[in-house]
Amino acid sequence: MAALVKPMLPLATFGGQQNGCLQHQLAKLVQARARRGYEHDIGQLAEKLKKRQVARGHLGDVLEQMGRQSELLPELVKNDEEFRIVQQRDLGHNTIEYLNLLQHDKLFSCRLCYTHAHWLWCEFHKTHAYRGPRDISVDAYVDHLNSDMGVVALVEEYYHWLSSCNDKAEAKRALKTLANVESLGDLLDSYNYSSVDADTSSYELMDFE
């Protein structure tokens, strides 16, 4: 009885599979390195706020719970037909701590970040803020949404637009995207945390060229 021998893959196909596997592994290594860099950098940013004696809130704690309960970015997840956006997520410790402080700092320390004057941005936001097209067919945007920075950016954008002289209406868009809520006060109240001044800005940015 003749033994069954599995035919060998053509060399071109085998080589292509190896290259594809290698590229995938390299991409994962790059992503892991970026995550470590982000976690370190946002930890440093949180430490700067602590040194300025910024009060610690509970916004990070709330968003961390919502992430575990698959309640973040609800509209984007709902319209994601290819299931590319993660539903359940665990925010990193440094991200949670920064968001707790951001509730009271209100982006004051980085108030020139998110303006069109990118040369005035701090190093953290120059490195980690997403500035590409907001289209879920774009891989880089999906990667951003699936990262902790995707959550942080929406809260920062909320405070940025809240401080804007002419574009305060954009602030609600950021919160709708983040958690489908009208205000951070409502969000904090729903988790029985103090929401005093959660939706106020301590400064106002004038439009400039």
Curated annotation (Swiss-Prot):
Superkingdom in the source lineage: Viruses
InterPro entries: Protein_Ac34 (IPR009657)
A Pfam family recorded for this sequence: DUF1247
Protein name per the record: Uncharacterized 24.0 kDa protein
